[in-house]
């Protein structure tokens, strides 16, 4: 089954590169979609976030995240060096502004995978950013995905479900919605959207 669009708007073919932001509720499959997209098309540039979270086994500085302490993160915020930032589970995460702007200036399409709070901040600071909402096929499917992980306590799952309802209600704030019925299909649709924003030709494969 193909991924489906809701609320698309035609974009002129000569449009300059625009920042593409992918957001959606927890459990909808954002990371899976992005990972698949970058496996098939490694030329897609995904912004690496800065975080105060401690590295997990196998994670490398500058690859999964830029790992910084609280003092360094405070400086990034104070100096306006973050395009957006948010706190989650006691740790802070933020998108370095300069790296994103440098890539856009070079004419490259840029992808951010962030939460609703971050997407709203990006919209405020970069009004021409293209916000893409990744939605589940149904609420029941999202509940199944969140409860099927089997790695979290019931109270955490309840908090995630409550947050998901708030995030789903914010869908109308986004420029376009992709329904995640298939990782392969929705990755292809996301790539097509990014290329459409930059005026590039589609990439087959």
From Swiss-Prot:
Top-level taxon in the UniProt lineage: Bacteria
EC number per UniProt: 2.7.4.8
Enzymatic reactions: GMP + ATP = GDP + ADP
Protein's cellular compartments: Cytoplasm
Entries under CDD domains matching the protein: GMPK (cd00071)
Enzyme class: transferase
Keyword Mitochondrion: no
Binding-site list for ATP: 24-31
Alphabetized Pfam families for the sequence: Guanylate_kin
Predominant subcellular localization, coarse grouping: cytoplasm
Bilayer-crossing regions: none
GO CC term, one of those recorded: cytosol
Keywords tagged on the record: ATP-binding, Cytoplasm, Kinase, Nucleotide-binding, Transferase
Gene Ontology terms for molecular function: ATP binding; guanylate kinase activity
Residue ranges occupied by any Guanylate kinase-like domain in the UniProt entry: 17-195
Family: Belongs to the guanylate kinase family.
Described function: Essential for recycling GMP and indirectly, cGMP.
Entries under HAMAP family matching the protein: Guanylate_kinase
Protein name as catalogued: Guanylate kinase
């Amino acid at each position: 089954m193909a991924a489906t669009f809701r609320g698309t708007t035609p974009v002129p073919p000569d449009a300059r590169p625009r920042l593409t932001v992918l957001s959606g509720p927890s459990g909808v499959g954002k990371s899976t979609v992005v990972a698949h997209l970058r496996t098939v098309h490694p030329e897609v540039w995904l912004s690496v976030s800065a975080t105060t979270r401690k590295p997990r086994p196998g994670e490398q500085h500058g690859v999964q995240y830029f790992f910084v302490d609280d003092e360094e993160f405070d400086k990034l915020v104070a100096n306006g060096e973050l395009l957006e930032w948010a706190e989650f589970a006691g740790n802070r995460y933020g998108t370095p502004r300069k790296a994103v702007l440098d890539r856009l200036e070079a004419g490259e399409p840029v992808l951010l995978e962030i939460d609703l709070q971050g997407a709203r901040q990006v919209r405020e600071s970069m009004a021409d950013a293209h916000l893409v909402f990744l939605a589940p096929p149904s609420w029941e499917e999202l509940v199944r995905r969140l409860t099927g992980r089997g790695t979290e306590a019931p109270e955490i799952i309840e908090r995630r479900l409550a947050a998901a309802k708030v995030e789903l209600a914010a869908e109308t704030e986004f420029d376009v919605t992709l329904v995640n019925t298939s990782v392969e299909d929705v990755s292809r649709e996301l790539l097509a959207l990014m290329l459409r924003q930059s005026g590039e030709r589609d990439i087959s494969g």
